[in-house]
Amino acid sequence: MAKADKTWSLKEIDESRGSSKGTAFLAFKQLKESFDEGRDFYYLNSAQDGREIDKLRADGRIYESTVNAILLTEHGYSAVVDYLDG
């Protein structure tokens, strides 16, 4: 993952919109087939990216129960927000 890239977690999207937990994840699932990993989102696997996931959790960027994390790029974020806005 390019460290300089601005990313959004699903939790951050839920909270910024005042949505219930899981709303952004459901939108992501609907759009996932049209997304490209590395362009639209980054998938962090707990086995390989555990330290980064722990830092995201400590920073409050992901839900406490998150095992594997999804971070959306600007492009992915815009697509999810557009989907949620209908």
Which residues fall in each region the model found?
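Positively charged, aromatic-accented nucleic-acid-binding surfaces
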Residues: 1-29, 42-86
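Short, solvent-exposed alpha-helical "recognition" segments
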Residues: 30-40
